[in-house]
């Protein structure tokens, strides 16, 4: 049974085809790795799978459901960038508040628990944290 199905997906940025008619099927229970040089499209396909980008053409299904603008599917996915994408002035607490508004299953109780376990000062600015 296919868990992820990518069919004929193309994504272009300023005339550069990052993905060109890509096809991929991932069966339930499988583990895949994406390997390739810079610019090969690894991050682009991940962002398409998470619904961050919308393909120019083709379709992406997870459990037979379209990903883009699908809240139920997006609740099950996360993309963690290696680049800072918060406002430079955001504190950890401010970022948590933003996420609490985006994710219906957000738990402040779990947030407080993790903050205490890892001894995190949530008043610290995100830009001051190490990766």
Region locations from a protein language model:
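Conserved ABC transporter NBD signature motif
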Residues: 58-73
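Short hydrophobic beta-strand immediately N-terminal to the Walker A/P-loop
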Residues: 32-34, 46
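Helix-to-loop junction immediately C-terminal to a conserved catalytic motif
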Residues: 50
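ABC-family P-loop ATPase nucleotide-binding domains
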Residues: 72, 81-131
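Short coil-to-beta microelement around the adenine-binding A-loop and adjacent beta1/P-loop entry
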Residues: 16-17, 71
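Walker A (P-loop) phosphate-binding loop of ABC-type ATPase nucleotide-binding domains
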Residues: 37-41
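Conserved structural motif at the start of ABC-family nucleotide-binding domains
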Residues: 4, 19-21
């Amino acid at each position: 049974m296919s868990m992820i199905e990518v069919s004929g997906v193309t994504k272009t940025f300023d005339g550069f085809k990052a993905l060109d008619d890509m096809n991929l099927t991932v069966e339930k229970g499988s583990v895949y790795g994406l390997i390739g040089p810079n610019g090969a499209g690894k991050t682009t396909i991940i962002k398409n799978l998470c619904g961050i980008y919308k393909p120019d053409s083709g379709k992406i299904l997870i459990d037979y459901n379209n990903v883009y603008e699908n809240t139920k599917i997006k609740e099950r996915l996360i993309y963690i960038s290696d680049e800072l994408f918060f406002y430079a002035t955001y504190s950890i607490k401010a970022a948590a508040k933003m996420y609490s508004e985006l994710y219906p299953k957000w738990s402040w109780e779990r947030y407080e628990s993790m903050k205490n376990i890892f001894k995190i000062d949530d008043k610290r600015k995100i830009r001051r944290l190490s990766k």
